[in-house]
Amino acid sequence: MISKAIIKKVSIAPRKARLVVDLIRGKEIKVAKAILMFTPKSASSIVLKLLNSAEANLAQNINLKSNDFYISEVYVNEGIRLKRLFPRAKGSGDMIKKRTSHIVLKLSMAKEIKEEIKAKKKEVNIHGTKI
């Protein structure tokens, strides 16, 4: 994992958010953005913003192209439930649970690029001179 983005207390049910998240797991950033743009679900815009945030974190921390990365981990956890009362007949009421989600997205480097960076690091020893 190189870059991570978390969004908490999103007002969408985790079950609905997982439908969108499952579509992009393991995909490259460019492909995932295309999938999210054309997915007609309300969670897709939220996950797209989260992906853009993770990409911005990546650009801020290290100077590598975002094309070299893929979504290694993305999952949806259940957040707090807001309990509301819906009035019914004879003075009674039903409980409505407005569910929220916590979404976590992690980006990692592609395996080929990891191997290239390891090879470059082996050429340079601890003091910064070539072996």
From Swiss-Prot:
SUPFAM superfamilies hit by this protein: Ribosomal protein L22
Disulfide bonds: none
Entry GO MF terms: rRNA binding; structural constituent of ribosome
InterPro entries on file: Ribosomal_uL22, Ribosomal_uL22_bac/chlpt-type, Ribosomal_uL22_bac/org-type, Ribosomal_uL22_CS, Ribosomal_uL22_sf
UniProt KW keywords: Ribonucleoprotein, Ribosomal protein, RNA-binding, rRNA-binding
GO CC terms: cytosolic large ribosomal subunit
Source organism, top-level taxon: Bacteria
GO terms (BP aspect): translation
PROSITE patterns, per database record: RIBOSOMAL_L22
Annotated function: This protein binds specifically to 23S rRNA; its binding is stimulated by other ribosomal proteins, e.g. L4, L17, and L20. It is important during the early stages of 50S assembly. It makes multiple contacts with different domains of the 23S rRNA in the assembled 50S subunit and ribosome.
Family listed: Belongs to the universal ribosomal protein uL22 family.
HAMAP family, A to Z: Ribosomal_uL22_B
Subunit record text: Part of the 50S ribosomal subunit.
Protein name: Large ribosomal subunit protein uL22
